Amino acid sequence: MSHMMSACGVICSECPAYLATAKGSAHQQLTVDAWRRIYGLSETAENISCGGCLGPDEDLFHTSGRCLARRCCRRHGFNSCAECPKESCQDLERAQSLWDEVPHIGSTLSPADFEAYARAYCGHRSRLSAARASGRDPRPSVPAKNEEKGGQPTSEHDGLKPAR
């Protein structure tokens, strides 16, 4: 399977929510049970349906629609934050900080649990930096779309073009 990367560098195509959605409701319930045990999350199987962070809103894990880094990428037609000419921003930092503790949690997991429920979230910062440095992004192109009312600027990145 080719890698699909989120705006912030998480590997969507290896994310438990993405994989469980493709495999069906039984796998979604297994994922919910594992997330409850590992991360203390109280999700429902219906809430973890996800088709990838930069996909259509109706195909998202319910929290991804609120991600400002995702919104910015979609608004500017970027495949990920790696294409943005800004070196850093609050939207990206906020998105990436959600995953910073996963490697530490991973050290307490069995190898099977780490592989299934944590690995996709590890290395997100270095993955995004490598994509920026190489000038390539391992995702298919996503059409630009301003999701805010009236198309008004809503981010410090409005007016930016891809760094290429």
Language-model features: locations:
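Cysteine-centered metal-binding/redox modules
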Residues: 1-160, 164
